[in-house]
Amino acid sequence: MGNFHATTIFAVHHNGECAMAGDGQVTMGNAVVMKHTARKVRKLFQGKVLAGFAGSVADAFTLFEMFEGKLEEYNGNLQRAAVEMAKQWRGDKMLRQLEAMLIVMDKTTMLLVSGTGEVIEPDDGILAIGSGGNYALSAGRALKQYASEHLTAKQIAKASLEIAGDICVYTNHNIIVEEL
């Protein structure tokens, strides 16, 4: 059986609000949609942190557990937990094989965490990952720049995923949006 992957995750800080959205499609290889309603965005650490994954499903669950453990260990300090997780992820021979990326955020900070040791905080309060990530990122930036006074963070996140779903074959319209 092939690898299960492909998705789009989008996160935004906007006017004091934060939201993260993910689609529900799980694709096996490049040909078969195996699931339409996967939940790839979750609340962690007593509902104070949002995390979303793109990549291999089994790997992502491992990373969710690992990140939540780091959040507990560092008492909810998002940046410290992300840096320590990235160091462990990059430094461990087995963990380096994991094929996934995470976006993690709380009310003040948003970070992209990857297995190559990257922990990146965006300048503009927007991140997107996955196969439709560039489409969602473009849509989100345009919405935030030109319609920001009329839209909430949740509305920007949902609309960005809808636009990505219209373009990317690995992204569907079963969108889950979580807010803090």
From Swiss-Prot:
Reactions the enzyme catalyzes: ATP-dependent cleavage of peptide bonds with broad specificity
UniProt keyword annotations, A-Z: Allosteric enzyme, Cytoplasm, Hydrolase, Metal-binding, Protease, Sodium, Threonine protease
Cellular component terms (Gene Ontology): HslUV protease complex; proteasome core complex
Location of this chain's protein in the cell: Cytoplasm
Activity regulation summary: Allosterically activated by HslU binding.
Gene3D superfamilies named among the record's database cross-references: Glutamine Phosphoribosylpyrophosphate, subunit 1, domain 1 (3.60.20.10)
Domain of life: Bacteria
GO terms (BP aspect): proteolysis involved in protein catabolic process
Pfam family name, one: Proteasome
Single GO MF descriptor: threonine-type endopeptidase activity
Principal EC category: hydrolase
EC assignment: 3.4.25.2
Binding site for Na(+): 165, 168, 171
UniProt family annotation: Belongs to the peptidase T1B family. HslV subfamily.
Subunit structure: A double ring-shaped homohexamer of HslV is capped on each side by a ring-shaped HslU homohexamer. The assembly of the HslU/HslV complex is dependent on binding of ATP.
Cross-referenced NCBIfam families: ATP_dep_HslV, PRK05456.1
HAMAP family recorded: HslV
Stored PANTHER family: ATP-DEPENDENT PROTEASE SUBUNIT HSLV, METALLOPROTEASE TLDD
Protein's name in the database: ATP-dependent protease subunit HslV
Organism, scientific name: Bacillus anthracis
